[in-house]
Design a protein with these regions (language model features):
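Bacterial N-terminal signal peptides that target proteins for export
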Residues: 2-13
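Blade-terminus and WD-like Trp-Asp/Gly-His loop motifs, strongest in beta-propeller folds
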Residues: 51-63, 69, 116-124, 177-186
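Extracellular-facing segments of soluble proteins and assemblies that are Gly/Ser/Thr-biased and enriched
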Residues: 105-147
Length: 225
């Protein structure tokens, strides 16, 4: 190798070393796929990219787990930004997992995912996906989804339409997926939303109430205690 070639190779290696040393590290932490962020600590001083993986949910319908990534970045003014992405991995036999669901947040938008377990029949996996804004001007939006082990497809449950039929159109409420009922209905807890001064709120839920969503009829009914 000539001296010129050797110098060029050395420059390339030094450049690669610099890039690798300055690239943000991806810190893996526990199973917090529901609310993973780029910040940690009381003063939010620990700012970096992070990754989380849920435990594997197992049933006769297959195996599934979720991953969440919070990607940290800064602009020229050193302002901090965080963007999330979540994925659901599924396998029939525990081998060769494939991504069957993926959702990426917009700039400075968080996305989380909860794996709530398989139905009693082992054919459907219940999930909850949440989207929020890191600038705090965006409301937290939650969606319930189900993975069908027969088709391998993930579909959103039409809970908004079902609650509109029960509670009415102009109704504000906070909802959270509880899990599966004994009859493989999906249990949803609704309650009052946090107060805000950004708009006039219309409440129709006085106290936390659990509803059962029938997967076949797409209807809601109050769940027995």
């Amino acid at each position: 190798m000539s001296d010129r070639s050797a110098r060029s190779a050395t420059k390339i290696m030094l450049c690669l070393a610099f890039v690798l040393s300055t690239a943000p590290r991806l810190i893996c932490q526990g199973g917090n796929t529901a609310s993973l962020t780029c910040w940690e600590g009381k003063d939010r001083s620990n700012f970096q990219s992070r990754k989380a993986k849920s435990p594997t949910a197992k049933a006769s319908g297959g195996f599934a787990y979720a991953e969440a990534v919070a990607e940290a970045s800064k602009d020229m003014g050193d302002a901090q930004f965080c963007k999330n992405k979540v994925q659901l991995f599924y396998s029939k036999d525990g081998n060769d997992y494939k991504v069957v669901y993926e959702k990426s947040g917009l700039e400075d938008q968080g996305v989380g995912i909860r794996v709530l377990g398989w139905s009693h029949t082992g054919t459907q996996l219940l999930l909850e996906v949440a989207v929020w804004g890191y600038d705090r001007d965006m409301d937290l939006v939650k969606s319930a989804l189900a993975l069908d082990s027969v088709t391998g497809e993930v579909k959103e449950l039409p809970l908004s339409d079902a609650f509109e039929r029960v509670l009415g159109k102009d109704c504000e409420y906070d909802s959270s997926v509880v899990g599966w009922g004994n009859d493989d209905s999906v249990l949803i807890r609704v309650g009052k939303t946090p107060p805000t001064t950004r708009y006039n709120q219309t409440f129709c839920v006085d106290k936390p109430t659990v509803y059962a969503f029938n997967m076949r009829s797409r209807s809601l009914a109050r769940s027995s205690p």
